[in-house]
């Protein structure tokens, strides 16, 4: 199963879209890519939205047909994550698990907050990647960010092909082989919105990163929530459910690919120099 990307327009522009292709045909990274690459070995597929050390706030579009990756906007302007010293941009390869959904109608019994209406967020702690890459990963743990009153899980994973992958099998292995990384992850998620005038984010479980078993339970809950969504048992709101592979679902539409423009890649547009500024946050390490 081979995945590739179809880029429309230049990165860092409002027009830019990155579609995912499987064997040359456009698929939805939200609905068509299987959650598991190999369920018996607990190997999952992850869609990379933001490569580490970059600033553009890229995400799978829930509302557009076939859910391309695009840059988030606010009041018509492209959004970028600020650099919070000593970090630069996103500190991990950041993305999402396909075929998962954090249901905004359900309050989690332990976080006491509803889901954030997005696919499940993933932090891949290995080496550099690219937007639209479909990585095969193994789960190590999960943090529960409380983002503006919503439960926003952050699943910690490692690419199975990463040199460190054989040594990392649960969350305690991360501290052993990558000391300081979980503390830095907690700090970054806590402070990264402060330069934009927002308050510090909070965590459930006092910021503790839960282990692999707990993370797997969260993933299963979000998988079941997505299944209800895609089969029409939960109202989708503005979420586009169009897919090209799930024949038994109401929104199965293989012909939808014909409306996707042909690839038109271009060199990235220049980013304003202000995005390179470092912000020094009081109370951060």
Swiss-Prot record:
Diphosphate binds at residue 79. GO terms for cellular component: cytoplasm. Pfam families: Pyrophosphatase (PF00719). The keyword Transcription regulation does not apply. Keywords: Cytoplasm, Hydrolase, Magnesium, Metal-binding. It is found in: Cytoplasm. This is Inorganic pyrophosphatase. It comes from Komagataella pastoris.
């Amino acid at each position: 199963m081979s995945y590739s990307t179809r880029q429309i327009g230049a990165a860092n522009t409002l027009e830019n879209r990155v579609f995912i292709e499987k064997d040359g045909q456009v698929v939805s990274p939200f609905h068509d890519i299987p959650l598991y690459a190999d369920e018996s070995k607990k190997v999952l597929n992850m869609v990379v939205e933001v490569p580490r050390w970059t600033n553009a706030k890229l995400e799978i579009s829930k509302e557009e047909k076939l859910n391309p990756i695009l840059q988030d906007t606010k009041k018509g302007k492209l959004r970028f994550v600020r650099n919070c010293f000593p970090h630069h941009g996103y500190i991990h390869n950041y993305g999402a698990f396909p075929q998962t959904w954090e249901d905004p109608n359900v309050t989690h019994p332990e976080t006491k907050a509803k889901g954030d209406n997005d696919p499940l967020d993933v932090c891949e702690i290995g080496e550099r990647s690219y937007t639209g890459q479909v990585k095969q990963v193994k789960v190590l743990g999960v943090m529960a960010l409380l983002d503006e009153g919503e439960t926003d899980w952050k699943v910690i994973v490692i690419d199975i092909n990463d040199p460190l992958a054989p040594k990392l099998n649960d969350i305690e292995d991360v501290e052993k082989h990558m000391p300081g990384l979980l503390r830095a992850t907690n700090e970054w998620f806590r402070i990264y919105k402060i330069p934009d005038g927002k308050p510090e984010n909070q965590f459930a479980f006092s910021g503790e990163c839960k282990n692999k078993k707990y993370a797997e339970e969260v993933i299963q809950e979000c998988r079941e929530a997505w299944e209800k969504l895609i089969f029409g048992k939960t109202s989708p709101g503005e979420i586009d459910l169009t897919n090209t592979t799930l024949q038994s679902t109401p929104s199965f539409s293989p012909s939808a690919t014909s409306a996707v423009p042909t690839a038109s890649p271009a060199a990235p547009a220049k980013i304003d120099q202000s995005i390179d500024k470092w912000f020094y946050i009081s109370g951060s390490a």
